[in-house]
């Protein structure tokens, strides 16, 4: 059971930890008899596991740029459906890329093109680039936010390629295309693999993108088979300052669980929206709400913001939460929100697969 001591530690660490519900702990490492080669992926803190402590963000981006597809100095790339024009002429070797969506930044990192990014829109509500992509991405200058990019700032960077998102800034395409060749991919989320292919095509690295995705698919299948994933149901939960979000199957993390073969509880098999929300204010929790929609064999919990991380102590120590069977069995894991929710690309997906190695960990 997640105990009050752990939850107080969460609250104390929230101010310093921006993307997870907890920081480091002093508990013993958890190990699994079925995964003897696994090196302390989980630190046990009063019964709750914090995943990703062994992750190395500086190893996230490919060290070298992927090889370009053979062909002329300029190529044709397709925009996402609904964007005019359908086809854009782009340089085969762009050197000054401006990227406006997190999944595209992740894709460029996976392709080893991070050094060519001269600016990137910042995540909404953040003053810095995503930490999970490491120091290769952290110093990249911001140009507004993903929902409100700074057009003047973009123009000042003199880009030779702009990558944008139909799902984030659909009305800005004409203005962006007036600055430099611009390719829009689809809304970030469940379609992340197609968006990676779109970034690959826009940077003349379609073959490299396909190879990366084939490698991911093989590894996801291998992890699923090794850890008997299909016989376990996993829950995806995100805490905000006043809500508990329970995710369905039409979103980024659910697509990764699907690739691994992890089952989902019946209450989370909806597809008409990314998630449902349950009130989690003090007043809501005092009414003893039914949180069974969040329950499963294992629950993966992330926090949407530092304020949500600070609030997590109250939510996870509430009577309604304590009733969940996964909580009783010490099968609640705290995960990185950048990796599970906002990354929405191959590097983030690899991180989720790493966390899913605990899906069949023994009940403690």
Task: Show which residues each predicted segment covers.
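A short, structured surface patch at a secondary-structure boundary
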Residues: 69-71, 96, 100-153
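Structured C-terminal subdomain patch of bacterial secreted/periplasmic proteins
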Residues: 295-364
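Alpha-helical, coiled-coil/dimerization segments enriched in small aliphatic residues
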Residues: 248-282
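Ligand-binding pocket segment of bilobal, Venus flytrap-like solute-binding proteins
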Residues: 73, 274-308
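Bacterial Sec-exported substrate-binding components of ABC uptake systems
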Residues: 2-16, 20-103, 208-237, 308-311, ...
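Proline-aspartate-enriched helix->loop->beta-strand connector
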Residues: 151-163, 181, 291, 295-299
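Short helix-initiation/N-cap motifs at beta->coil->alpha
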Residues: 83-85, 143-151, 278-286
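Extracytoplasmic substrate-binding proteins
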Residues: 171-245, 342-364
């Amino acid at each position: 059971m997640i105990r009050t001591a752990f939850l107080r530690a969460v609250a104390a660490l929230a101010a310093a930890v921006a993307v997870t519900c907890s920081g480091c702990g002093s508990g013993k490492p958890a190990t699994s008899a079925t995964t003897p080669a696994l090196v302390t992926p989980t630190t046990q803190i009063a019964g709750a596991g914090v995943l990703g402590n062994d992750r190395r963000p500086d190893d996230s981006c490919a060290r070298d740029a992927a090889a370009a597809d053979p062909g002329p100095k300029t190529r044709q790339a397709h925009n996402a459906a609904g964007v005019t024009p359908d086809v854009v002429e782009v340089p085969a070797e762009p050197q000054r890329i401006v990227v406006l969506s997190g999944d595209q930044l992740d894709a460029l990192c996976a392709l080893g093109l991070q050094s060519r990014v001269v600016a990137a829109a910042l995540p909404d509500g953040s003053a810095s680039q995503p930490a999970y992509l490491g120091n290769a991405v952290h110093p990249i200058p911001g140009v507004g936010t993903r929902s409100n990019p700074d057009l003047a700032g973009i123009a000042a960077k003199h880009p030779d390629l702009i990558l944008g998102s139909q799902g984030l800034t659909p009305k800005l395409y004409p203005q962006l295309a007036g600055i430099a060749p611009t390719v829009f991919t689809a809304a970030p989320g469940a379609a992340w693999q197609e968006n990676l292919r779109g970034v690959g095509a826009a940077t003349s690295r379609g073959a490299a993108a396909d190879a990366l995705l084939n490698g991911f698919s093989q590894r996801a299948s291998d992890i699923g088979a090794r850890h008997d994933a299909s016989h376990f149901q996993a829950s995806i939960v995100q805490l905000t300052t006043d809500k508990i979000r329970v995710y369905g199957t039409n979103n980024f993390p659910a697509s990764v669980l699907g690739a691994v073969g992890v089952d989902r509880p019946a209450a989370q098999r909806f597809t008409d929206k990314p998630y449902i929300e349950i009130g989690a204010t003090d007043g809501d929790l005092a009414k003893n709400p039914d949180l069974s929609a969040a329950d499963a064999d294992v629950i993966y919990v992330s926090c949407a913001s530092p304020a949500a991380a600070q609030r997590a102590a109250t939510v996870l120590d509430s009577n309604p939460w304590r009733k969940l069977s996964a909580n009783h069995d010490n099968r609640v894991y705290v995960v990185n929100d950048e990796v599970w929710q906002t990354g929405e690309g191959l590097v983030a997906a690899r991180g989720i697969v790493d966390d899913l190695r605990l899906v069949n960990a023994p009940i403690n």
